[in-house]
Design a protein with these regions (language model features):
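Conserved catalytic cores of phosphodiester-cleaving nucleases, focusing on short active-site segments
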Residues: 95, 123-146, 159, 180
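Domain-level recognition of nuclease-like catalytic cores that cleave nucleotide substrates
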Residues: 171-209
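Flexible, glycine-rich phosphate/dinucleotide-binding loops
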Residues: 40, 55, 136, 189, ...
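Accessory nucleic acid-recognition modules appended to NTPase machines
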Residues: 1-125
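Mg2+/Mn2+-dependent nuclease catalytic core
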Residues: 145-165
Length: 209
């Protein structure tokens, strides 16, 4: 969320005191801030990165604990939303390992992108890695799964749309080629649509020494 969005959500004034509060949380490692491209101007986005706080706010805060509560929540929509958010955060915090898995020697810029092309078609990309040396932009799609990730017909079309929209946007460096990287828990399942992905990265890659 942006500073203005956070201020609105909390009911606090988005002034100097609020800015100082965000800076203290950033310096302590509780949140991170990063640029979000795609809008008319670059926005600074703040994200909670403390894993315990993410769990506490989702499952403990304002919830009366009772026997069997966690078992009842397992594999519910609430559980999968939390798992998806924390897996995406895990990937963001392991950028050097992702870079190694993709065999990228240097990353000149990394960011999330949410924008439109000149025709007004929109798309959101979890993470873009720009590599000037290889003249390549890696469009990273991050997906939590409990087995090898299988690409459906709809998801295949969604990935191709993201590639097309980003390619036609002002963010894309026209001298760079584009490649799609899927970062998932257990890797990519080979099927009729798996060829849309150029690179597959798994949890094993994130924790490789």
């Amino acid at each position: 969320m942006t500073q203005a969005e956070l201020a609105k959500a909390t009911g606090l004034s988005s002034g100097g005191t609020f800015s100082k509060l965000l800076e203290n949380l950033y310096e302590s490692g509780v949140i991170r801030k990063y640029p979000r491209y795609g809008a008319e101007r670059v926005e600074t986005v703040y994200q909670l990165v403390d894993f315990f706080s993410l769990f506490y706010l989702r499952f403990v805060s304002d919830v009366q604990c009772r026997s069997g509560m966690w078992h009842a929540m397992d594999r519910t929509g609430k559980f999968y939303n939390w798992a998806g958010e924390t897996f995406e955060l895990l990937c963001v915090l392991h950028l050097p390992q992702i870079q190694k898995a993709l065999r990228i020697y240097s990353v000149d810029d990394s960011y999330c992108w949410n924008g439109r092309d000149d025709e007004g078609n929109g798309a959101q990309i979890d993470m873009v890695l720009e590599c000037d040396a290889a003249r390549t932009d890696y469009l990273c799609e991050i997906k939590f799964s409990e087995s090898r990730f299988m690409i459906s017909t709809d998801f295949n079309m969604n990935l191709r749309n993201k590639l097309s929209v980003f390619q036609r946007s002002g963010q894309h460096k026209k001298t760079h080629s584009l490649q799609i990287a899927l970062i998932s828990s257990f890797g990519l399942a080979k099927d009729a649509h798996s060829d849309v992905v150029n690179h597959s990265v798994s949890l094993d890659d994130l924790f490789e020494q």
